[in-house]
């Protein structure tokens, strides 16, 4: 009891910051997300990522242990080995929860509690950092309350909110703050820790980063490099500079090996491109070339930086003395910002929305760098460093109550700048309908299938995780302990997955329920299966399914393409019609077609002023324009046929407008005629 009281007394201000973070979380998301057996809100998210995180954990939980790969998952893309790492299911938590699987409920999610933990850690660590930079003593109540207000800037850091329950593992912004805290604790403490203790600390950070999300490895790694730069400037000796880096890298690599990062099938590792940051975007919103490249640090961060600079100018002598006493750590911080700028920009340098230049780099370096292809995320490090440093300097160089008022204004400004996102999250997560079961699999026959014991595996005929039915089917398989032959993975080689799934259809198994989604229905005549339809989904089975009525065979399988999924240039598209103007182009959604002969019929108007063709080709590989035979040519209908002796991956039809005559496309129907 005495030790607990002493701990609470010593860390009361950091715990207050953590409480602030937790309260913000509860206000935004409510308490229902904390219920470990409530999962519908995860599956109802319009993005596939939360479903990936949760169902990845469920499949992993039901997959057996396979040493030495504790993170191996054989259930998600059966019979191949994947890793819990590539479903972004917070691997460390997944492994721990799998070990405790015998005492956990059958339906269990940890994402809600993880979110609460992230917000609390963000607030607690932010307060501790701001207080330390601000030179605040534990007994200085006024300034400590000011540091808690400053922590509000970090609790409202944009990346934390935007990633929470979207890319949930990436919401661990607190890992960067923890690394900064370890740095300051080690370098400003009167009793500096030994090199061995530093190796232990940074080894733990390597363990956390590799076990939560890979993008934190370079961010925290750069903080480590900065600490070693400082130690080098202070001439601590080679061991003090090198060994913490060795410890961090060795622990992270060992953990990645155990998690199966290097032994996963379908892992592409590198996307082959870089999505870099516009560094002006740290202070100016909307400059990111895409949502993924938006790195805005918030209005409150900008305000804090301006106020910190003003304080330094007003108290120039005090500031000069402060920087003189901390020269080495300031130099190391500048090195850190430069490193982060280079890493986050990629090889194409943009500033203020304008591309300045592109640096050619060797392919070997590109392949390594592109493992972190969304490298703009690395700029979060600079944003958080500037935020905590600025808030700390405001606390140090503005007097008394003024600092508290200014930091409160900064926190309020941070929230005001995020008001649209915060309101959206509050509205979404406080809507009772968001927690309802909205699966499209409502036919009672689904549960009969699960209870029959006839099936233990689900197999998709082709690789398409973007279809609505896909996630309902995968959730059904995961909930009932079945395996699936298809899943959405990070860094996945989609080409290999597409080719593999098509090949698996050559060997049919009686314990497998086959799902034919969209264009896959065209191939139904190719396989000696018994076919059934539940909730509009075509299912196939080697053996008859007792209690279900088989769907009659069709003479010519046909399916219509979804026009609203088309890519349209110089035109408009909705569910019914695509209209092309002068120079317009329509490119349909991508399908996988099995070997055979096909007829494609386009209905609409103005086709006598168009150019129509079909193409196919794997992602980032050569695209092949097909030889087709037009059997019907009219202004309101175009028909062409073709044959293929092998599967066609990412097959599409294109329509180009040749002049200023408008072209309307109302239906594109594909038939398998042989």
Predicted feature descriptions by range:
Residues 1-39, 243-244, 320-336:
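Start-transfer (signal-anchor) and selected internal transmembrane alpha helices
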Residues 27-33, 65-68, 149-166, 253-264, ...:
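Membrane-interface helix-loop junctions at the exits of transmembrane helices
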Residues 138-144, 225, 245-249, 388, ...:
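Signature aromatic-anchored transmembrane alpha helix within multi-pass, membrane-resident enzymes
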Residues 49, 97-101, 114-125, 172-175, ...:
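Transmembrane alpha-helices of multi-pass, membrane-embedded glycan-processing enzymes
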Residues 116-133, 143-187, 195-231, 244-251, ...:
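Membrane-embedded helix bundles of polyisoprenyl
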Residues 418-560:
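Extracytoplasmic
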Residues 25-121, 157, 167:
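Membrane-interface coil-to-helix junctions
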Residues 47-48, 249-313, 552, 558-559:
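Periplasmic/ER-lumenal interhelical loops and adjacent helix-loop junctions
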